[in-house]
Structure formats: C-alpha cells, structure tokens
Amino acid sequence: MTEQDLDAAHRLSLSVRWPHRLEDWAFIQRLGAGYVAENDEGLIGTALCWSHGTEFASIGMVIVAGAWQGKGIGRKLMAMVMAELGSRNVLLHATAAGRDLYARIGFQQIGEIHQHQGTVFKSPLMPLQPGERIRPLGSRDAAKLAALGARATGMPRATVMAALQDVAEGVVIDRYDEVIGCAMLRRFGHGYAIGPVIAPDIERAKALISHWTGTYGGAFLRIDVSGSSGLGPWLTELGLVQVDSVVAMVRGDAPLPDHGVRQFAIINQALG
C-alpha cells in the first residue's frame, strides 16, 4: 500500500460502514506497512501492519469488498502482512466476520474491546489525590509518555506516541513532576476519539476521561475500552453507550504490561 492507494482504501472502508476519514487512513498508513488487493474494477481489499519494537506487532484495517468476501482474498492479504512481520508476536482485534479466519491461522483470544460512543452533556468532576493535577501534555513530556505507554502495554510505544502528539491533544496526571497517567483525544470518524487512556487505577482513568468529556461536551465522542476495564456502566451513565465489541487476539506470546499502570482505553483497534 502506498499513499496513492488511500482514496480507494477510504472508499472501501466506507462501503463496509467503517467510519474512518481519509485523514484517519493517512495517519495509520504512515506508521506502518500494508498490502492491497486489486482487480479490473479497482481496489477490493486491504491489510495493514505495524511493528512495535523487535518482538511485537499489530495487524488491522483488514477489509475485503462485500462482493469479494469468501474468496480467499482476506487469507492472502493476511499471509502477506504476516510475512512482513517475521517472527514477531502479533496482536489484532477481530470483528465477528474475521474471527474464524484468524483462529484458523493460529490466533487465540486474550480479551475483548468494547466500543462506546455518544454525546456527553454533563461531565462529572472526578477528584484526584493530594499533589496530583491534570495538565496539558507538553513537548518535554515525550520520553515520559513513551515510557508510560511501554509500561501499560508491555511493548515499545515511542514511535506511536510521538506520532499521536502530532494529531492529538493530550493531558497527563502530574504528581510532583512525575507523569502517572495520560489521555489523548483526536479527530476521528464522525467526531472525536479518546485514547489511549493510561492510569494507575480506574478512578484516575475516570478523571482523565472526564476531562475530555467536559471539554468536548455536546460533541460526538468514541472510546474503545478493554472488557475488563470496569468502565462500561460509568461510560453508559455519561451517555457513551456500548455499540459494538471486538475480540483481542494474539499469535505467539502476549505482551506483559507493568501491573502498576494500565491502559484502560486503546488508541484504536489497529494500533492497540
């Protein structure tokens, strides 16, 4: 896949009712590698992949045009991106349509991601601990942000987090000049996406999310949280209802996050 394929890839994703804007495609394409399937009518399939250091990678944006599904195109595209990634342990988020294909090529379920979205009109003020404050993410926070992302996911995140800073707004929880949590928000699809949200515990995660739901009250918001996050009922009360879920899968070994910090919401279903 090259930059010249983005317009056609965007049309393909719209045809299967995925909300990505052309700018959303451009962001993820710049960060990774990908392959397309074409015929005389044009582009009919896509698959992208992203390396996270030398041991881990993720796969996403695996799409086949409706009229061409069930003809082995998805399997061929997956084989190409898997070859691109070599011996890395590979993560992905599977829709119901793709889950069986991924299971047949060695992926196993390790969790779920729940997609919440909607509009928040009244955002609660969540208290922090003494000495803690939420402040804007600064340019000098890059190394701290990368370290926090690596601890929360168990994978190197410097490249992804740096790229996010170019397209997203960010806030951190600062405790005596130590960054212990972060949340980012960017334009995505029909409105805005919150993620990642990284925090030591659920109360601080709620404080970070509340910052953005308050700042962007009345706007359409989306957040994808882990099924074990405990945030579902609270998000629903805010007005961000669950509309879909996908299965988190891995081929190989899953990364081992630091137990002292947790990624409550992912960046997106492609990058994790």
List the predicted regions and their residue ranges:
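Short, structured loop/turn "capping" segments at alpha-beta junctions
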Residues: 110-112, 127, 155-160
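Active-site-proximal cofactor/substrate-binding loop regions of enzyme domains
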Residues: 1-89
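Conserved N-terminal entry element of GNAT/NAT acetyltransferase domains
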Residues: 1-3, 120-139
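Conserved catalytic-core motifs of GNAT/GCN5-like acyltransferases
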Residues: 89-93, 108-122, 242-254
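Conserved active-site tyrosine of GNAT-family acetyltransferases
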Residues: 102-103, 107, 235
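Intrinsically disordered, low-complexity, positively biased terminal segments
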Residues: 2-7, 38-39, 51, 55, ...
